[in-house]
Amino acid sequence: DYGKNWRAALSIHHSGNDLVENITYEDIRVEESDEAFLCMGYFFVPQYYYDGDTPPLGVVMRNITFKNVTYNGKKKAPSYLYNVMRQTIGGVREGEGTYYDKSNPDYKITMENIVFDNVKYQGTKIDSLDKAKECGFMIEPEVDVKFK
């Protein structure tokens, strides 16, 4: 249900043409979440643009660090890192990956240098993409994510 994915204990939701950069979440402990643990995404909502249908060009989120962040909850709380999420009637659904219009690669929307430094999920240290997936992290392949 993509309608709920954007509600998370820690999240960054971006829609527009500005760059979101140099953000650090540090020394945070989440005891429980009824929704997701982490969520980052770019929301493409056409009415936010003057011409009605032009997404931003280039990197929109970069240099985001999650350092010493822990989820201790007993409930499963997935995490989502989406390059594009589109608003639809009744909620939000995952977009088409990095490119809004795959026939026009100039419309590139990306996340770069997303760092997980000592992030733990229910006791498991997230130090690789495989570990992240095992813990319910849904990360688009185009997202530039690093693990420490």
Q: What is each residue range found by the language model?
A:
Residues 1-148:
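Extracellular parallel beta-helix/beta-solenoid repeat domains
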